[in-house]
Amino acid sequence: MSRYRGPRLKKIRRLGALPGLTRKTPKSGSNLKKKFNSGKKEQYRIRLQEKQKLRFHYGLTERQLLRYVHIAGKAKRSTGQVLLQLLEMRLDNILFRLGMASTIPGARQLVNHRHILVNGRIVNIPSFRCKPRDIITTKDNQRSKGLVQNYIASSDPGKLPKHLTIDTLEYKGLVNKILDRKWVGLKINELLVVEY
């Protein structure tokens, strides 16, 4: 199954706010959610929605998400927290959280087009797993800096998570440590995703 490229507002109406997918918001008063009242389907539907929220927010395919759940399951700590840490330490998500891109798909495009350096080396894999003390910069040409400049200027420094720092003048971000659960940018119950 390939990455979702369809209408984003449909997904937001169905699943709720997904800041990584788009900045758009549905019109208030649009009541398109249908309520189903059955026992087993209700529980299944809740778990499926939580999984879909995670998938669409981070821009993952079904196979990628299963691989991350498998890796998190092998860890000795809580599977749900490890899963969220793995997803939050992806390069495309870190660019989004630093404010260098407006959405995670936009950050993926920056990485794919070779505008981003990690520790002085070009990385063109959006799923690259960042580690603490990684330095993320743009290429030293005007085009790359111009792409990131508008997003950094419009981003809110108060929303920056504690595990990241950014130098807006040099277009440089630093990963300080691994993310805490309370700084995840998405309201989700990760245990339901693992149970699914």
Curated annotation (Swiss-Prot):
Subcellular location: Plastid, Chloroplast
InterPro entries in the cross-refs: Ribosomal_uS4, Ribosomal_uS4_bac-type, Ribosomal_uS4_CS, Ribosomal_uS4_N, S4_RNA-bd, S4_RNA-bd_sf
All residue ranges annotated as the S4 RNA-binding domain in the record: 89-157
UniProt keyword annotations, A-Z: Chloroplast, Plastid, Ribonucleoprotein, Ribosomal protein, RNA-binding, rRNA-binding
Entry's Gene Ontology cellular component terms: chloroplast; small ribosomal subunit
Main subcellular localisation: plastid
GO annotation, biological process: ribosomal small subunit biogenesis; translation
Lipoprotein recorded as keyword: no
GO molecular function: rRNA binding; structural constituent of ribosome
Family: Belongs to the universal ribosomal protein uS4 family.
Quaternary structure note: Part of the 30S ribosomal subunit. Contacts protein S5. The interaction surface between S4 and S5 is involved in control of translational fidelity.
Name under which the protein is recorded: Small ribosomal subunit protein uS4c
Species this chain originates from: Elymus canadensis
